[in-house]
Amino acid sequence: LLSGNYKTKFNQIISNKLAVLSILFFSLHVLGLLWTDDLKWGLTIVKKMSDFLFLLPILLTITKKEYIKYYISAFILAMTLTEILSYLVWFEVIDPLHKATVGNPTPTMSHISYNPFLTFGIFLIAHEILFNKHLSKLYKYVYVFFMVTMSINMFITGGRAGQVMYFVMLGILIFQYYGRGRKVRATIISLIIISSIFLGAYNSSSIFQHRMNEAVKNISIYNTDRNKNTSVGQRITYTINSLEIIKNN
């Protein structure tokens, strides 16, 4: 921020579509304050969304391409340490941190945020295993170990959005690995791996089983008024409203 050259940085931000979308996304929340019925809650949401205004655009101006591998390594290390803390809470070796509980051990952030970050960490590790031809056997074994432990960790926490992202990520990785010429094989392998992991997690993790049963129940009775205020009901409502807005505009 204090390094100067602000004109170049500004041009760098506005020329990046992701950064512009990030700023517009935040701006929509600010604009929404004009018609909200609960200004206090609206300001709370705006505060939560402030990362979209500051974090991504600022990171874009200070990151350098030649250091990307170090950024990725630092992120993987951070998620590995967080995962270890999660297991320590789960096994009751340490007292729960932040808002974590033994039943939902997400020590450094809420389960809503934790699982998407964990999914991204798993994706980066799996990508290294599958596509880095220069990866030594030792690193490969270490990466496989943490990919497995992170995947298990995914299903002892309650973040359904991250779990959905996890299964989508697996499909993407498999299709990337087999390429465009072997779509049928990639589809079959994706279905086998994803369904096997899902069934294994469902039968072995009580919290995952409970969250899945809850989601199915909420969807099945969505049309009743008492169900629309659940997390699943709200997501369905937001999706329907968004599609209507897109359709009408």
Where are these regions (language model features)?
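Transmembrane signal-anchor hairpin modules in multi-pass inner-membrane enzymes, especially those
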Residues: 1-30, 62-69, 73, 128-141, ...
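Aromatic-anchored transmembrane helix interface
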Residues: 18-25, 39-63, 70, 74, ...
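Alpha-helical transmembrane segments of multi-pass inner-membrane proteins
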Residues: 30-31, 67-97, 109-180, 192, ...
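Membrane-interface helix caps and helix-loop-helix hairpins in membrane proteins
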Residues: 34-43, 155-157
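Membrane-interface helix termini and inter-helical loops of multi-pass transporters
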Residues: 39-41, 94-105
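Extracytoplasmic catalytic/substrate-binding loops of multi-pass membrane glycan-assembly enzymes
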Residues: 50, 226-239
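Luminal/periplasmic active-site loops of membrane-embedded glycosylation enzymes
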Residues: 112-119, 218-232
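A membrane-periplasm/extracellular boundary helix in multi-pass inner-membrane enzymes
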Residues: 177-226, 240-248
